[in-house]
Amino acid sequence: LVSWTFAESHKYVWDKKNEKVSIQWGENLVFLNLKEWNKGKASIKNEEIKDKKLDVLRGKAYAMFCNDSYWFIAPYKVFDNGVSRKIVKIENQKDALLVTYSSGGVTPGDSYLWVLDEKYTPLYFKMWVKILPIGGIKGTWENWITTKTMAKVATTHKIGPITNIISDVNTGSDLSEIGLPNSYFDIIK
């Protein structure tokens, strides 16, 4: 279990084992059951949404989760289904890892070239993604922390003039360890 805030505006609680996630931004709160889409719930200003806007909010929350969780834990996603990995040579005959996402998420086909340090920790990446008109844009992995559960995550990513900060990182083996009641996801059982 993990909770985090992305770019000071998207707050997440993710139970990866049970495939449930909550996403809060502004006055919106969405609970997604990643195994059973129709069980997802959404509210605006604490008022449950049940009309056509429910699917719009679930879709937006899912897209945000795919993007923001990538930036949060990308090194842990390289062995997901639909991901290919290849060692390639870059300048000075240094090895780099080319990671391509052929399926899953909301932007299949995106590729990232990861440049690693001597301990194989990502230093920076170059990306070729569908949402950007030019390829090879460089971004960084900075300010690494080790969580209570011993996961290592970079909390700063600089991409051109944009800096994305990941904050409020909390991990645990159950919801109570991250400060939430164990019934937190019962709304989408």
What is the role of each PLM region?
Residues 1-47:
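N-terminal mature ectodomain segment of secretory-pathway/periplasmic proteins
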Residues 1-6, 63-71, 115-132:
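Short, basic/low-complexity N-terminal boundary segments at the transition from targeting/disordered tails
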Residues 2, 10-12, 21, 83-86, ...:
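Residue-level detector of beta-strand structural context in well-folded domains
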Residues 6-8, 17, 26, 79-81, ...:
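Residues that act as N-cap/strand-start positions at coil-to-secondary-structure junctions
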Residues 15-17, 87-95, 147-149:
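Short, ordered beta-strand-loop transition motifs
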Residues 29-37, 44-66, 106, 157-189:
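Catalytic loop of the DD-peptidase/beta-lactamase superfamily, centered on the K-T-G motif
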Residues 41-108, 132-135, 187-189:
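Flexible, processing/modification-adjacent segments and terminal tails
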Residues 94-183:
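Gly/Pro-enriched, hydrophobic low-complexity segments
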